[in-house]
Amino acid sequence: MWKLKIAEGNKNDPYLYSTNNFVGRQTWEFDPDYVASPGELEEVEQVRRQFWDNRYQVKPSGDLLWRMQFLREKNFRQTIPQVKVGDDEAVTYEAATTTLRRAVHFFSALQASDGHWPAENSGPLFFLPPLVMCVYITGHLDTVFPAEHRKEILRYIYCHQNEDGGWGLHIEGHSTMFCTTLSYICMRILGEGPDGGVNNACARGRKWILDHGSVTAIPSWGKTWLSILGVYEWIGSNPMPPEFWILPSFLPMHPAKMWCYCRMVYMPMSYLYGKRFVGPITPLILQLREELYGQPYNEINWRKTRRVCAKEDIYYPHPLIQDLLWDSLYVLTEPLLTRWPFNKLREKALQTTMKHIHYEDENSRYITIGCVEKVLCMLVCWVEDPNGDYFRKHLARIPDYIWVAEDGMKMQSFGSQEWDTGFSIQALLDSDLTHEIGPTLMKGHDFIKKSQVKDNPSGDFKSMYRHISKGSWTFSDQDHGWQVSDCTAEGLKCCLIFSTMPEEIVGKKIKPERLYDSVNVLLSLQRKNGGLSAWEPAGAQEWLELLNPTEFFADIVIEHEYVECTSSAIQALVLFKKLYPGHRKKEIDNFITNAVRYLEDTQMPDGSWYGNWGVCFTYGSWFALGGLAAAGKTYYNCAAVRKAVEFLLKSQMDDGGWGESYLSCPKKVYVPLEGNRSNLVHTGWALMGLIHSEQAERDPTPLHRAAKLLINSQMEDGDFPQQEISGVFMKNCMLHYAAYRNIYPLWALAEYRRRVPLPSLGT
């Protein structure tokens, strides 16, 4: 039986360590000795069958396995009767209150013992296969993924195969060469034959690959991983010279000027490229060489495949200047750097690159910055020393990335513990039900306090291209270590709100000095245009995006400013200024003024804002309206608010909700869901955005219609149904935030009940 473990380390593993006793850590274990009742087993099998039967209709999982576990362990039973509001009935205060209480009690029961809310954070289908390939190469496949793990990984692959036989970049996407190839190889490594798998998964996948040009058309990241595995040749890849890491810092393309994720992906990739590392050529690798190409492997002209990419994978076509750069490196530079005496320079570059990798590993407790980087850095450590401590420390942190749901085992981006908990706490606080959920709030407060990053990265962190992190919050847990501006702002907001509440209910307030550290992080990340970046100060030259080496992402080379980060920071600093009016007053005032200007300047012509981390214009507009409202901007004194209200009202569906397709993100224009369906998460965002604009004072009818949809959509136990995917990154790849379906309908109903006048049955 699969069990989710919370905040657990391993006293018997000397390679596993933590900065705060593993608070926020979430790991899955299969317990073969657990004696499950027939009812438990049937419940698990039932939700698996239901997902499989509906896999083409609702592609994100409901994240049900741990929910069933927690509700069973806490003996939760929904005792508050469900309410429905008829078409010709008005929403009453009692109906809103009852629905809200049901949602609050259900969601509180899902809180973990350390105070956070666990949730799946995955969706891209290129996360897990490289991990399987890595442990296969290093000889650790059986220990990392024993039989029950393999079974669940295969379940996940089968569940998310498209009807045409391929796999998308993410679970809702059209089939791509990249993820179809990775999924096929993963199935073969895990023991499926060339024609094996449920519903002929392997044969259908291989047919899709060969019908679309064979693996020679895989994009650059795929070429890299296949070269590492031994089913492609390095000579067919664009150069990734490690010499970038010893360039003079004044050059515009120096790694210090790169976006941290780009830097952290190409750091280990460049090491592996510089070494031309290839894993052991096993019988399976030789079979894959035969299966994945439309011609004999030894007859392929690898030089001609370097620029080939399947049209299904191309989101960002490479400009001519980039092709010229890679050609120059390929033809002129690489032949020199592999020969004496220039190979001495390469050796120095590899040593410098390795130094940076070890630094990043140590400062993240071997979690690294994310799952793509994790696997690459782990492999590099094995290449350096297969029996070394660095690699063993990486192995110890693999469980931090693994997640199990009714659709199988997947790899998380790295966990959204702090992000989800910050919003969960604010939603619960807005419910005005403190007297009913005091212990929940106290535990959540404790988690947030314990998760704050207490120190900057070690040593001379600026020479390692790192920014300050002391006082920040990460996306996941403290061990991760990477500061994020909006996570910091949301954590700061929670601590500020808790500081105004009785300590006997919510626990001791955080020390002011730690709040000052958070403010310092936020102030350090604002650019001259008023916008706030996410991880590190933005400021590199925009033309560097022309050198984006990926084909399926956009805006990945340098750090940018984001509407959501800017808005979160405005809201946090406005509240901080109210409670601590004497601290850096002038700087905070200037920050807010410039940030508001940024929001106004980045509004789209239709009145919306592009959301960088959620779908899409609905998400961005909710954030922007929240920031503008906090800064004192209203419908009557701000044209941007009026335009945003017009956009939201115009996009409201006939049933009272909002529903936006994920296609809005890559297309950068508003696209409604197919069939004009509503999505409850999107409805929550839009409803809160309109409430921020004080729509209730002008015409509350749109708010009542949206609230009625939320009330009538609540399930029997107080949950809300899982619908379409809601998160995104880098314009073109979707991310499943499983907690969103609880947080945002609940939060929207809380705001609605608190701020919109409602009739009462007693009057």
UniProtKB/Swiss-Prot annotation:
PFTB repeat residues: 100-142, 150-191, 441-485, 515-560, 592-632, 641-682, 703-744
Keyword list, A-Z: Endoplasmic reticulum, Isomerase, Isoprene biosynthesis, Membrane, Repeat
Keyword Repressor in annotation: no
Entry keyword annotation includes Magnesium: no
Subunit structure: Monomer.
Molecular function per GO: beta-amyrin synthase activity
Annotated site residue numbers, Transition state stabilizer: W419, F475, W613
Family: Belongs to the terpene cyclase/mutase family.
One BP term from GO: triterpenoid biosynthetic process
One GO term describing the cellular component: lipid droplet
InterPro entries listed in its UniProt record: SQ_cyclase_C, SQ_cyclase_N, Squalene_cyclase, Terpene_synthase_CS, Terpenoid_cyclase/PrenylTrfase
EC number: 5.4.99.39
Active site per database record: D486 (proton donor)
Pathway info: Secondary metabolite biosynthesis; terpenoid biosynthesis
PANTHER family linked: BETA-AMYRIN SYNTHASE-RELATED, TERPENE CYCLASE/MUTASE FAMILY MEMBER
Name the UniProt record assigns to this protein: Beta-amyrin synthase 1
Entry comment describing in which tissues the protein is expressed: Mostly expressed in roots, and, to a lower extent, in stems and leaves.
Encoding gene per record: OSCPNY1
PROSITE patterns per record: TERPENE_SYNTHASES
EC class of the enzyme, as a word: isomerase
Topology relative to the membrane: Peripheral membrane protein
Subcellular location: Endoplasmic reticulum membrane
Induction: Induced methyl jasmonate (MeJA) in adventitious roots. Accumulates upon Cle-mediated signaling, an elicitor derived from fungal cell walls of C.lagenarium, thus inducing the accumulation of saponins. Triggered by ethylene (ACC), rose bengal (RB), nitric oxide (NO) and hydrogen peroxide (H(2)O(2)). Accumulates under heavy metal stress in the presence of NiCl(2) and CdCl(2). Influenced in roots and leaves by relative humidity, and in roots by soil water potential.
Enzymatic reactions: (S)-2,3-epoxysqualene = beta-amyrin
Protein's organism: Panax ginseng (Korean ginseng)
Its biological purpose: Component of the oleanane-type triterpene saponins biosynthetic pathway. Oxidosqualene cyclase converting oxidosqualene into beta-amyrin, generating five rings and eight asymmetric centers in a single transformation.
